[in-house]
UniProtKB/Swiss-Prot annotation:
It comes from Bos taurus (Bovine). This is Splicing factor 3A subunit 1. PROSITE patterns: SURP, UBIQUITIN_2. The keyword RNA-binding does not apply. GO terms for molecular function: RNA binding.
Length: 793
């Protein structure tokens, strides 16, 4: 603390005038003698501190001691107000001034300078002209509050001109239409990278928000803005005053910055002048083994850090007791949580179970005993008998590691039966119990070991393996040589075939197809191809889909070798409806594979006209092991176009010798079957090609039409009203489909971008009108949810 001399006279006047000053003042007036007289026993502060003390004393005298307590609380860290403390040397002067102001003897302090300096300043100010005095007064003004920031200035970021225009235009629309427009825009353009600045974590979001505020102030100006602008337009002097104040504030900030830099420089120079390495060892203290000292108990780094924080908080706020109570409460909470945790037992069941990964924590919870509820008392200071002083102790040396378990300590795993090191047993148990199929893996590994290495098999396995060997090698252990190898392949374990399933991801599609094709043999592929082509007769024992004739008797096809001896009354292999003008069939010769078409019906059996003779064909070369079945040269008019000859393996269609077929006789004219009746209009799906032109439809139909919209029932979309209701709208035919979507949005809340409309099998587009799709009165439109990224179903 600054110390001042205890004196009866202030220091400024010289020694010759000291005894004369009080006598002159007493002669002038007795009333002013009391405040001007120096008091013996009071330390007078320096002029700059005296001004603060006098002002504070005047305020405290007027407002009471509550004001003093408020100043002491607000300025607790300000050293200029240390005179408020009772232990400060200037506190007596402060109390003296407070009593003088209460009695009305003291005057309000004008400045913290001596009287001689005040008289000189008054004389000089009287001599100066008025303009200079005004300048001096203006220079002493210090701005208190910063000027208001510019509301319509925002530095644009370094982006392209197009992106800047997008941000500005979006901000203008948001300022005009409100926050609801911003929410809808974010939902609609959430996948558009051009509008990423709408997200709060984007770098342009602050600039966008500033633009919205500026546009909002322009479109919806505050109440006093017009009055302020009108006043500034009529009185330019006010604008100049604002500019001058802003300039003075900039100068003040610059002076403050320079002052801080000068203080830092002074502090740096003061630190540089200290020779930190210039020290002298005064004394070395050696502690003897039998010496007993009153030292505090040892602390941990955590406790030391907590003590430092408590001390700093006490110096700052004076809340040491509350902090200690908070620390104790935290420790008690942790102890209660640990005590409430029940000790869990490790499940030793060998069945397949889904184990949690927290098994290690549970085991540790078993081994570690719960902490005691009562806090442990602090350790007592060590006694001389217990203290061991080590002279070679190095606190920086690394602590010795705990002894590792011996490498030859192995434990048998209860899961796999393998020998596991003791250090890795816990990790092995955790990993083994994570897999619920460890039993299958264990059995499979045991079987593989038994089949690979028979040397280490137990006694019963040796007996069974010898029996298997005797059954396979009867030339050694028996008398029949024909039984050699009869058991080969029979002892193979019949493993259940794992079905290949697809998980639904596009990345695993090719891998799943390869896995499914790996289990299919070549024979199964050939059979599947011939079943699809119709070359193989279907099994009548299997259940067929679709209606069948009640009087139809399924018959097996005759062998190919007796095809020439079939009587004329034998029915064909497959019969189809035919017109009445068709002549009766004579013989069945060739089976043709005709693909199934929707209409007209096609025949699967080729019949020859009467009078034709079947001659034997030359033998077919068997090198490629395939038979080519040729088609007849002509066919009845009811048959479909002739397909190419089918290539059939010999295992399914043997090729008997057949004579070449001569040209048949001219067939009588056959009338085609009557066409099938058209399907009803409700079952037909329209296409855009079948629609009537828009102009012609408008000429035929005039006036508005009533349209029904079938809304789906989607309970998971709670934000939309999709309860399966039917919406009815009356619209003119010239309106576009987008008008319907807007009305659906108003009724259900479903955005137009999420709507998918279908009318009679056609997905209608927004840009086309109702007349384009030939919508009549009472047309029904089905509403569905548009799935982004997927194909239209």
């Amino acid at each position: 603390m600054p110390a001042g001399p205890v004196q009866a006279v202030p220091p400024p006047p010289p020694a010759a005038t000291e005894p004369k000053q009080p006598t002159e003042e007493e002669a002038s007036s007795k009333e002013d003698s009391t405040p001007s007289k120096p008091v013996v026993g009071i330390i007078y502060p320096p002029p700059e501190v005296r001004n603060i003390v006098d002002k504070t004393a005047s305020f405290v005298a007027r407002n009471g001691p509550e004001f003093e307590a408020r100043i002491r609380q607000n300025e607790i860290n300000n050293p200029k107000f240390n005179f408020l403390n009772p232990n400060d040397p200037y506190h007596a002067y402060y109390r003296h001034k407070v009593s003088e102001f209460k009695e009305g003897k003291a005057q309000e302090p004008s400045a913290a300078i001596p009287k001689v300096m005040q008289q000189q300043q008054q004389a000089s100010q009287q001599q100066l002209p008025q303009k200079v005095q005004a300048q001096v007064i203006q220079e002493t003004i210090v701005p208190k509050e910063p000027p208001p920031e510019f509301e319509f200035i925002a530095d644009p970021p370094s982006i392209s001109a197009f992106d800047l225009d997008v941000v500005k235009l979006t901000a203008q629309f948001v300022a005009r239409n409100g926050r609801q427009f911003l929410t809808q825009l974010m939902q609609k353009e959430q996948r558009n990278y051009q509008f990423d600045f709408l997200r709060p974590q984007h770098s342009l979001f602050n600039y966008f928000t500033k633009l919205v505020e500026q546009y909002t102030k322009i479109l919806i100006p505050p109440k006093g803005l017009f009055t302020k602008l009108k006043k500034e337009a009529e009185n330019p002097r006010e604008v100049l005053d604002q500019v001058c104040y802003r300039v003075e504030w900039a100068k003040f900030q610059e002076r403050e910055r320079k002052k801080e830099e000068e203080e830092k420089e002074k502090e740096r120079v003061a630190y540089a002048q200290i020779d930190w390495h210039d020290f002298v060892v005064v004394e070395t203290v050696d502690f003897q083994p039998n010496e007993q000292g009153n030292f505090p108990p040892p602390t941990t780094p955590e406790e030391l850090g907590a003590r430092i924080l408590i001390q700093e908080r006490y110096e700052k706020f004076g809340e040491s007791e509350e902090v200690e109570m908070e620390v104790e409460s935290d420790e008690e909470d942790e102890k209660q949580e640990k005590a409430e945790e029940p000790p869990s037992q490790l499940d030793q069941d060998t069945q397949v179970q889904d184990m949690d990964e927290g098994s290690d924590d549970e085991e540790e919870g078993q081994k570690v005993p719960p902490p005691p509820e009562t806090p442990m008392p602090p350790p007592l200071p060590p006694t001389p008998d217990q203290v061991i002083v080590r002279k070679d102790y190095d606190p920086k040396a690394s602590k010795p590691l705990p002894p590792a378990p011996a490498p030859d300590e192995y434990l048998v795993s209860p899961i796999t039966g393998e020998k596991i090191p003791a250090s890795k047993m816990q990790e092995h148990m955790r990993i083994g119990l994570l897999d619920p199929r460890w039993l299958e893996q264990r059995d499979r590994s045991i079987r593989e070991k038994q089949s690979d290495d028979e040397v280490y098999a137990p006694g019963l396995d040796i007996e069974s393996s010898l029996k298997q060997l005797a059954e396979r090698r009867t030339d050694i252990f028996g008398v029949e040589e024909t039984a050699i190898g009869k058991k080969i392949g029979e002892e193979e374990i019949q493993k259940p075939e794992e079905k290949v399933t697809w998980d639904g991801h596009s990345g695993s599609m090719a891998r799943t197809q390869q896995a499914a094709q790996a289990n299919i043999t070549l024979q199964e592929q050939i059979e599947a191809i011939h079943k699809a082509k119709g070359l193989v007769p279907e099994d009548d024992t299997k259940e067929k889909i679709g209606p069948s004739k009640p009087n139809e008797i399924p018959q097996q096809p005759p062998p190919p070798s007796s095809a020439t001896n079939i009587p004329s009354s034998a029915p064909p292999i497959t019969s189809v409806p035919r017109p009445p003008a068709m002549p009766p069939p004579v013989r069945t010769t060739v089976v043709s594979a005709v693909p199934v078409m929707p209409r007209p019906p096609m025949a699967s059996v080729v019949r020859l006209p009467p009078g034709s003779v079947i001659a034997p064909m030359p033998p077919i070369i068997h090198a490629p092991r395939i038979n080519v079945v040729p088609m007849p040269p002509s066919a009845p008019p009811i048959m479909a176009p002739r397909p190419p000859p089918m290539i059939v393996p010999t295992a399914f269609v043997p090729a008997p010798p057949v004579a070449p077929v001569p040209a048949p006789a001219p067939m009588p004219p056959v009338h085609p079957p009557p066409p099938m009746e058209d399907e009803p209009a409700s079952k037909k799906l329209k296409t855009e090609d079948s629609l009537m032109p828009e102009e012609e439809f408008l000429r035929r139909n005039k006036g508005p039409v009533s349209i029904k919209v079938q809304v789906p029932n989607m309970q998971d979309k709670t934000e939309w009203k999709l309860n399966g209701q039917v919406l009815v709208f009356t619209l003119p035919l010239t309106d576009q489909v987008s008008v319907i979507k807007v009305k659906i949005h108003e009724a259900t809340g479903m955005p137009a971008g999420k709507q998918k409309l279908q009318y009679e099998g056609i997905f209608i587009k927004d840009s086309n009108s109702l007349a384009y799709y030939n919508m009549a009165n009472g047309a029904v439109i089905h509403l569905a949810l548009k799935e982004r990224g997927g194909r239209k179903k």
